[in-house]
Amino acid sequence: NFDEIDRSGFGFN
């Protein structure tokens, strides 16, 4: 998901 902050906090998960 590049649209929002994910588990890693980068939003690349």
UniProtKB/Swiss-Prot annotation:
Q: Which GO terms describe its cellular component?
A: extracellular region
Keywords (A to Z) from UniProt:
Neuropeptide, Secreted
Task: Give a yes or no for keyword Transmembrane in this entry.
Answer: no
Q: Where in the cell is it found?
A: Secreted
Annotated tissue distribution: Abdominal nerve cord and hindgut.
GO terms (BP aspect)? neuropeptide signaling pathway
Q: Superkingdom of the source?
A: Eukaryota
Q: What does this protein do?
A: Myotropic peptide, enhances both the frequency and amplitude of spontaneous hindgut contractions.
Q: State the protein's name.
A: Orcokinin
Q: Which organism is it from?
A: Faxonius limosus (Spinycheek crayfish)
